A protein has these predicted regions:
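Anion-binding (especially nucleotide phosphate/pyrophosphate-binding) glycine-rich loop
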Residues: 1-58, 174-175
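Conserved glycine-rich beta-strand-loop-beta hairpin in the small C-terminal domain of fold type I
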Residues: 188
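Conserved acidic catalytic centers in enzymes
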Residues: 23, 66, 185
Length: 213
């Protein structure tokens, strides 16, 4: 085929620097729209790879952790990049979550720089175990196992300081029935996991009240 020049205008309603994939939403929307315009010549996996290039332009690194689920839907596992391998995981019917934004901005670069260059072997082992548990939880559709496995020892301890009252909020929502709480992306948004809709709504209210003071 021949090169085609296309201009895309995107109405972005996800705040940049929120930790919930604003750049990925733009990249995914652009490649999805162009694919539709051209008659859908590309597969979902190919669209993810194209959208990764948009992420690289905006963030410096081509990665699929946000554009993957944005284009394929649900929960995905990025097994590797060379070669690129992405796998959709089944999602339990009783998988609900609440997301809250504290109304502050944390740059992705700042959040990345907060991470240590090296971690203890014990932390690496714990993280690998939780990653395995998380994947197994989705494969088994076991929301309780998913919740137990959402324990991050690599990023959360170093990024939670950017989020006002993070530890107190986490203690509160876990006591209130959440199965887990963690930082969305690089922050400052946070999310909590629940096993039913009513609990997710209640937890959402708790997080909203916390950040509104």
């Amino acid at each position: 085929g021949r090169p085609v020049r296309i201009e895309v205008e995107i109405l972005e309603k996800i705040a940049p620097g929120s930790g919930i994939g604003s750049s990925a939403a733009s990249s995914a929307a652009a490649v999805y729209g162009v694919n539709e315009l051209l008659g859908r010549p590309f597969s979902g996996k190919q669209l993810v790879e194209f959208a990764m290039m948009g992420e690289a332009l905006l963030g410096g690194t081509p990665h699929a952790d946000n554009v993957g689920p944005a284009l394929l839907g649900g929960v995905v596992l990025v097994r590797g990049y060379r070669p690129f391998d992405i796998v959709r995981l089944p999602v339990p019917d009783n998988f609900f979550y609440a997301v809250a934004h504290p109304g502050i901005v944390v740059s992705t670069r700042e959040a990345r720089e907060a991470l240590p260059k090296r971690i203890p072997l014990s932390d690496a082992v714990a993280q690998w175990g939780n990653v395995g548990g998380l994947v197994a939880g989705f494969a088994l559709r076991d929301v309780a196992l998913i919740g137990r496995s959402m324990h991050d020892v690599v990023a959360e301890p170093y990024r939670k300081g950017f989020i006002p009252g993070y530890d107190a909020l986490k203690e509160q929502v876990l006591a209130g029935g959440a199965l887990a709480m963690n930082i969305a992306g690089s922050g400052p948004s946070v999310f909590a996991l629940a096993s039913n809709y009513e609990a997710a709504v209640r937890i959402s209210g708790e997080m909203k009240r916390h950040f509104e003071g």
